[in-house]
Amino acid sequence: MYEPRVRTKSMERFVCSKEPPNRSERLLQDSAKRLKISRAALEQIEKPYTFIYQRLPVEIEGEVVNISSGIVLHNRARGPYKGGIRIAPDVNIWETNELARLMTLKTALANLELGGGKAGIRVNFEKIYDQFKDKLKQDFYPFCDMLKDHIMKEFVDHFVERGLVHIYIPAPDMGSSAREMMLFYNRTHDPAVVTGKPEGIEGWLPGRHEATGFGTAYAIAKYLEYIGKAPSDVTVAIQGFGNVGSHAAYYLNDFGCKIVAITDLYGGVHHKEGIDVVELMDHAREKRTIKGFDDKRTIDNESMFRMGVDILVPAASGHVIDKDNCDGLGARLLVAEAANMPVSFEAFIRLKEKGIEILPDTYVNSGGAIASDLEYKQGLGGMRYSREEVFAHMRQRFDNIFESMLEIKDQAGSFTQAASDIALKRLYQAMKTRSLI
């Protein structure tokens, strides 16, 4: 069969830099071989439809500071572009691109009528605060909240002016929250403009705030049920105690798991008899960190990764488990990817060889996307869901995904590879149906 020449480096040439090696493309390439999808078709699925760069000027004490931001619209074959807004000092076009691609795969795996997109805002709050602190009257955290509001108002204005309402549907992500989503609603008065809105705002969804953490815990409980192990018989360590990590800890504890170690950016705590998760959540809510919760029993990320536990839950940032540290990983049973792409492709292969199961990010942290789908439809149609209905819907979706992965796991090679196969097949079929490939 004739296969046209594929310009696989077209985006790289345009932005004058090479896309770093990443797991999602490697997995998709392997899936394409198993599914017998051509290189030309895969190129159309892998690469983004468009990306937008936007400078966001904000004034601080009479000086203008320009903040860089970007939106990657990856794929809308199955529905509107969907994905969060990440605010961090290391945001870049390639990370945003891979996160958008992961959203495309995640929504396809969950069989949602949504596509994939992502926004990134590159800002170093500590650096800017240090630059202006002699002139400022606020402490660090109030300054960050004020600056973030100014940045987001600029971002929202450009979002609306570019006609992206209902084309790209934002949501909270690392560095953003319901507070930032409210600004979209304030500007548009459209309950379906974003998901993850604050409680009480038109179109808000009960259970959306904790959905990703609940989904993470439920995915782990589902796996334990599959292998015939009681939650009370396993120990868990969690990296990250933001919205995802804290709620994952809460629900895992509620299901009966023993949470023995938790870390965040500034510190960590280790209680071999089990951490009081509710007390830790109260502490973190007040201090914005878990540091200081128990100064006598602390732990750092490196030590926690090496400690012997049944389940490790990376719930913070990406690429934290790689070829350099995976051999020293202490998890005996499972790594559950609550964060996006926390395990590199090389580490994935090595852990697979060692018999350590990985539940993929596109499954484990899909609770936010599943709940967002309900919130978006609620905003469009005016129907209302209770928290119990939202969680019941999520459980059903997670059950369906797990059974779909399990059905082809042996053929694909792992849960991670099975998830990639399912998502790619659905995307390919949708794009063929719409004559996009």
Give, region by region, the residue ranges found by the protein language model.
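Flexible, glycine/charged-enriched surface loops at secondary-structure junctions
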Residues: R39-Q44, N111-L112, V165-P172, G228-T235, ...
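Glycine-rich phosphate/diphosphate-binding loop of Rossmann-like nucleotide-binding domains
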Residues: P198-G203, G207-V309
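Rossmann-like adenosine-cofactor binding region
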Residues: G267-L359
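Glycine/serine-rich phosphate-binding loop and adjoining beta1-alpha1 elements at the start
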Residues: A88, T107-P231
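Adenosine-phosphate binding glycine-rich loop
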Residues: V6, S10-E19, L224, R332-I437
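Short, Gly/Pro- and small/polar-rich lid/capping loops
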Residues: F14-R55
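Glycine-rich, N-terminal phosphate-binding loop and its surrounding beta-alpha-beta segment
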Residues: Q54-E61, G70, H74-K135
